[in-house]
Amino acid sequence: MNKNYKNNLNESINNPSKILNEKIILGLDEAGRGPVLGPMVISVVKVTEKDLDKINSLDLKDSKQLTKKRREEYYNIINECFEVQKIVLAPEKIDEYMKTSNLNKIELSAFSKLSNHFLKEYENVKIFIDACSSSEQSFLNQFKAKLINKKVEIIAEHKADEKYKIVSAASIIAKVTRDNIIESYKEEFGDIGSGYPGDPKTKEFLKRFVKEHKKLPKIARGSWATSKKLLKEFEESKLHKWVK
């Protein structure tokens, strides 16, 4: 990547003054929906319409398709050159919400909160968002119902992070933010794997921790099937030893 590219791009972005009639574009996405360890991160990237070509000039893709090094490079560029907001939902907060809700509703609430942050200041807004439910139309209707401006233009599609660079940018922000948090966990807990239920290292870490501490680590989502199964197996093993 050209070393001067970031500086040139940064200089070409106008100061983001809060002008009601100025059209802005928002891209929203999340990272960490499925893992048993760590937070879910929901992010939004905002650009003005006249500066949309600046973000489109970047070779952005869905964050999962980029190398770690390239994600981090773009993370820095996006943060420096555009306005970014994010919500980090810790495991305990996800567990609390899951008692009365589900992942789709939790995401919708976070998406709408981030969007309304800008809708309070701007009237002319277009939103690109990665639809997190099986029905794009149902997601669109539920999302719009939570917005303070019902007239806002919304593009809600599956795999929007692969189709629209503004959503790719939000995906990168969310992914790198979560990855950094996972790395900080490793400093405290050692190798915990990726945090996904199917990762053998993650499962081994959880199993070992529960055996040693008789509870889940604070970084685990207790409402996940993987966590519930491990706790159940631990309780059954204790009962088996007592019976013997």
Swiss-Prot record:
GO MF: manganese ion binding; RNA binding; RNA-DNA hybrid ribonuclease activity
Cellular compartments per GO CC: cytoplasm; ribonuclease H2 complex
Superkingdom, taxonomy of origin: Archaea
Organism the protein comes from: Methanococcus vannielii (strain ATCC 35089 / DSM 1224 / JCM 13029 / OCM 148 / SB)
Cofactor: binding details: Manganese or magnesium. Binds 1 divalent metal ion per monomer in the absence of substrate. May bind a second metal ion after substrate binding.
Subcellular location as annotated: Cytoplasm
Name of this protein: Ribonuclease HII
Lineage, opening ranks: Archaea, Methanobacteriati, Methanobacteriota, Methanomada group, Methanococci
Family the entry assigns: Belongs to the RNase HII family.
